[in-house]
Amino acid sequence: ILQLWNSSITEKGSISIKGLSICDQFFLGQMWNSFIQGGTYMKAKKTVAIGMAALMMSGVFAGCGSGAGNDSDSGNVSLTIFQAKIEANDGYKKLIKEYEEKHPNVEINLEAVTGNDTAATLKAKMQSDPPTIFAVGGFNDLKDYGDVMEDVSDLDIMKHALSGTTDMFTKDGKIYAVPLYMEGYGFVINKQMFEDAGVSVDSMMNFDGMKKGFDTLKKKIDDGEMKDKYPNLEAVMEYPTKELWIAGDHDVNVALTHDFETANDAYGADTLPGTGFEDYKKMVDFQAGYTTNADNTANLNSVDYTASLEGGLAIERVACIKQGNWVAPAVETTDAEVLNKLDMIPYSVPGYSDGKYFVGVSGYWAIHSKSTDEQKKVAKDFINWMLTDSEAQKILVEDCKFIPPYDNFADIKATDPLSQRIMDANKSGNTMNGWVYSGAPNTWSQQVAGVEVQKYLAGEADWDEVTKTCIDQWSKLKTTQK
C-alpha cells in the first residue's frame, strides 16, 4: 500500500490516479480520506485493510486478481491457448509473436499437450484453470464442454469454411468451434518406384488402374527386376493392422460412408445398416494381398505403424502404405530424399469412391464462454486474423504444416507433396468424408471393427461374422452410451 501511495503522489502533493485500476483507485481514496480526517499513516493503512477485506468478501474485487486475465482500465488482456498438436507448436509461437507485436496490450500463453494425455489434461484444466481457447475434436467434446463453448458463428472466417467442415460442432444452427486444419488419406506411394516399373501416377487414379499398377510392380519385385536400384524393396505394400485405427477408423470409414453422409448422421443413428461391408472387405483384402505376409495374413497383426513408415516406406522397403499427409514429417526426418519421391493416389473403392481422397477436419478450436468479454473479443480477433491475414496464413501452411479447411488460402502452396495433393483435391472436389467414423459409438471403430478385422486376418472369423458383430455391437453400444 505504501509503495502504491508513494508512486501516486505528485510534486504538488496531490494524488494522481492516471493509469491506475479501479481497485488501486479505491485503496488510494480510502487512505486520502483518512489523512484529510486528521489520521496518521497507520490509521489510514488500517482503514484501507478493513475496507478491502469487507469488499473482497462481498465480491466487489472478484475481477481485480491476476486470474481475470485483463485490466479494463489499462486495456491489457492475457489469454491462454490449450492446443493438442505438438508438431505445430513452433508455428503457433511464431503466430503469437506476430500478433503480440501488432497488439502490445495482448499477452497470449501457449500450452501444448498431445497423445493419450490430451483428453484427461483438458478435463483437469477445465476444472481448475480453464483456458480461453482450447482444442476440441469430436462429438464427446461438444457433449462435455458445450455449455462453456462460445458461439463463433459470427466470425468473418466462417463465410469461407468449406462445406461440411463445421457440422461436427454445429447445434441448433449455431457453430461452437472453429475448424483449424484438415487431413486426408489415401495410398501414399513412392512414385519413382512405380515410374521405374513403367507405371505412371496418373494411370492409378481409379481402382482398376491402381490394381493394374500394383500388379505390375509386384511382378517386377518378384522377378528381381527392381533389386539393383532398390535393394531394400520387399513388397508393394505394408498393412500394419496391429494399429486398430488403421484397420478400424480409416478402413471402416468406407463401410460407414455407404450408410451415413456425415459424422453427425452416424452419431444420431441407433442402428447400423451395414450396406458397405463388402467394400470394407474388398479394401482389407486388397491391402493384405500386396504385403510380404499375403500368404499368412495373421502376421500383419504384429506389424505396427513405425514398421510400416520409418521402417517401411521411408527406407524404401515397401512402395506404398495406406496413410495420410501427416506422415510427411516422419519421412523427411528419416530420409528427405524419399519424401520428394512420394505422392498420394486416391482411396479408390471400385464403383464407389473411384478417384476420391478421404478428407476431414481433425482439429478445432473453441473459445471458453466464461472468459471475460475482453478475452473473448481478443480470442475471436486472434483466430480471425490467423485465418485471414496473408502472412499468418503462410505460417499456418508452411510452419504448422496445416491443410486449411477454408477457400481463402488459394495462392498458398504446401511444403510437401502429400499435403499439396489434399489441398488440390479440396479445390477440385475430388474428396469424400474421411471422418464419418468419428460419429460411431465410443470404442466401436477400433475395439469392435478393428479387432474384428484382426480376427478375420488371423482366420478366427469369417467376414459374415465380422459384419454381424459390427452391426450388433453398434446397437448395443448406442444403448449403453445414451
Predicted regions and their residues:
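Short, solvent-exposed loop/beta-turn-alpha elements that line the ligand-binding surface or hinge
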Residues: 151-163, 167, 228-231, 236-237, ...
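Short helix-initiation/N-cap motifs at beta->coil->alpha
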Residues: 112-121, 207-209, 299-314
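Extracytoplasmic/periplasmic substrate-recognition and gating elements
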Residues: 101, 107-109, 197, 334-399
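Hinge/lid segment of periplasmic solute-binding proteins
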Residues: 137-186, 227-232, 250, 341-347
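Conserved N-terminal structural module of periplasmic/extracytoplasmic solute-binding proteins
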Residues: 6, 12-14, 21-27, 32-35, ...
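C-terminal capping/gating helix-and-loop segments adjacent to ligand/active sites or protein-protein/ligand interfaces
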Residues: 84, 359, 399-408, 421-476
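Extracytoplasmic/periplasmic solute-binding protein
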Residues: 176-180, 185, 211-269, 318
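Glycine-centered hinge/linker elements that transmit conformational signals in sensory
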Residues: 214-215, 266-302
